Amino acid sequence: NGAVRCQKAGVDGVLLHAAHGYLINEFLSPYTNRRTDDYGGNIENRARFALEIIHGIRDACGPDYPIGIRISACEYLDYNGLDPAEGITLELSKQYAKLFEGAGVDLLDVSAGIYETMNTAWEPTGFDQGWKTALARELKTVVNIPVVCTSVIRSPDYAEQLLQEHACDFIGSARAHLADPAWANKALNGQDA
């Protein structure tokens, strides 16, 4: 009902948060999803919960209401000494991206990390600008829907470079705006942000 309420309130679209160890991500990840029923095991079963939500929104809100999904394209389990193959890898994310696009998702928002690797989801300031952009670049090669690039995008010039290189179609820069509420205005005026 959340998407229906958003639509009735005039919200332009919805973005499902299927990243960072939250509920939908827990179903998608072989690391957290140890179920043996129709919602666990193979990729189709692990994606079932997300796909049911997508189909439910599409049925309730109609074919023209934009649906996006934010995913952790890589869980980086190796950052904590775990086997990365036990979780979501870039290759697995490519399969999920195709499934989501096939289900009618209009936008793919690419992030990374889960609770166990939270520094890859909410990076400390020491992380290089745009260090996750390679994930978005790769996922963009397997889908025909717009891809959002996030990850410590501090500079408007760097954001523009990513767009010019076709690394992504949109830039997610929420943290830049939290750090500097004038970020977008500075970008428009050619100032350093």
PLM regions: where:
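Flavin-dependent oxidoreductase catalytic cores
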Residues: 1-193
